[in-house]
Amino acid sequence: MNSNFCRALVDRGPPGGMQLGVVAPAGQTPLAATEPLSNVPFLLYPGHSEPPYYDAYTGVFPYVPFPGAFGVYDYPFEPAFIQKRNERERQRVKCVNEGYARLRGHLPGALTEKRLSKVETLRAAIRYIKYLQELLSATPDGAPPPATSPPPAHTGHSNVPQPSSLVAESSGSPFSSSPFLESEEPSL
């Protein structure tokens, strides 16, 4: 193919139709299209652009509705779809966060004082559930909890005994002694 020629794309429709073309370099004449392009679908969705951009191309695209550039995301119905999708995602994230907040509210009091990550919250909840299961399995039905267990403490939504290891110590982090915050090694 010769690099010195330039093709012109012309839609040979009615005078009110759209013309698209490439400007030929000075001193060269553009080659006419061998067949009309009226059967080729060409959709234009105007977007936003700077005035210098579309002023430079007003002669090339005389029937294109400028101002505007051609953008991929400028379809007429896409913004509503994106807004609905984003709203659904916001609602989902809000619901998940509320679930974690409720779960934190059911953990013993010492754990609710610190803002826990989602992973820390789940790990602490797992350990607390295991602790409660061990407590229930060690206690016969109808018998009071053993004397070594601390009295029930108010922890938000539940009135479950708080393990003594959750009480804050004066040295170090108040949560360093909590068995519910220790890292859990995955068992294979």
Swiss-Prot record:
Expressed in teeth (at protein level). SMART domains: HLH. One of its GO terms (cellular component) is RNA polymerase II transcription regulator complex. GO terms for molecular function: DNA-binding transcription activator activity, RNA polymerase II-specific; DNA-binding transcription factor binding; DNA-binding transcription repressor activity, RNA polymerase II-specific; protein dimerization activity; RNA polymerase II cis-regulatory region sequence-specific DNA binding. Residues 158-168 have a biased composition (Polar residues). InterPro entries: bHLH_dom, E-box_TF_Regulators, HLH_DNA-bd_sf. Keywords: DNA-binding, Nucleus, Transcription, Transcription regulation. Gene3D superfamilies: Helix-loop-helix DNA-binding domain. Residues 80-132 form the bHLH domain. Transcription factor. Probably binds E-box motifs 5'-CANNTG-3' in complex with transcription factor TCF3/E12. Negatively modulates transcription of target genes such as CDH1/E-cadherin, perhaps by recruiting the PRC2 repressive complex to regulatory elements. Regulates ameloblast development and tooth germ growth, perhaps acting by positively modulating migration of inner enamel epithelium (IEE) cells. Plays a role in enamel formation. This is Achaete-scute homolog 5. The gene is Ascl5.
